[in-house]
Amino acid sequence: MRAKKFLAMAIALGMTVGLTSVPTLAADKKTFVFGDTTFNAENEEADINPQNTYAGWACIRYGVGETLFRYSDTMEIEPWVAKEYENVDELTWKITLNDGVVFSNGRACDGEAVKESLEGLIANNERAAGDLCIDSIEADGNTITIKTTEPKPALINYLSDPYGCIIDTEAGITDNGIVIGTGPYVATDLVTDDHLNLVKNEN
């Protein structure tokens, strides 16, 4: 009787292991396939366009986009695409970008590109526009100067929000919400509520 119980338990365990879903590595392709329950239209992550609702979370999560600043593991603000910032006065912020940052298509991520990205953000994302209260942005080489309509002591924190992923707006946004960013991956295909394909950023 004891042997039969042991055999039944072993069979049940084997079936459980067999049914467990695990990440798969496709043979000879170096392809990692995994599921994500948050990347869907219901969660307002229909694509990876950071200017679209909360899709900035997907843009940053999958390594396509990067923000000017980010939070460290200890929740401290640290540079990312940007190198440093200066709070010139209560309405003026000067941000210096890191040298040599490029988008995945090879375009330089300079002050003008960042200006375009932020202007597109506040034009298309109501939440970002309300948070940032940007009045004007000026670009000069590798720096941008932001003027706000009211004092914004937390401006750098807001620029660290995933909606602040810097994208190449000159390259445009595809109909299915694919953008060009500065991250380690490039999106090649996206179908909302189904899949997102990524390849290594060669730039």
Where are these regions (language model features)?
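Short, well-ordered beta-strand elements
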Residues: 29-40, 92-95, 114-117, 144-146, ...
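Hydrophobic core
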Residues: 11, 15-19
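Bacterial N-terminal signal peptides that target proteins for export
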Residues: 1-8
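Aromatic- and charge-enriched surface segment that lines or borders ligand/interaction sites
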Residues: 83-125
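Surface-exposed binding/hinge segments that line
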Residues: 86, 94, 129-170, 184, ...
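Bilobed "Venus flytrap"/periplasmic-binding protein-like clamshell domains
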Residues: 178-203
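N-terminal lobe/hinge region of extracytoplasmic solute-binding protein
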Residues: 35-88, 180
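Sec-dependent signal peptide cleavage junction
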Residues: 19-29
